[in-house]
Amino acid sequence: SLGSVASLEHGLTVDGLARRCLGEFGRVAQVYGSPDAPVRRAAFFNGSLGDNGEDALAAGADVVVCGECGYHRALDLLTRGCAVIILGHDTSETPLVGVLEERVVELGVSPKNLLCLGTEPLWHSVDG
């Protein structure tokens, strides 16, 4: 099932959306698609895209933003007119960490018994 779908502002491009993700999450995304391709509708999935690419296409998405997407799945979406922005699994779930923490405390778990991981990067990239 689809995470969420949004209609985006006029004039936004694939790279423009990827740059917004960088600004929000502070992590460089892997992007499949033409940098200047217009984005009108986006599908968002936290964690892995899994088999939800078909749902994104059916919803009319020009781009999928997700945490993980296999290479061949990304190529399939790309050849069918849908760009893919891959944030990293952990990065895509970071916005939910605080929400889940609050809910667990509401259910009676003491905050002193909670250890939340995922708010700081646990991995890094090496280049050059």
Where are the language model's segments positioned?
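Hydrophobic structural segments
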Residues: 1-128
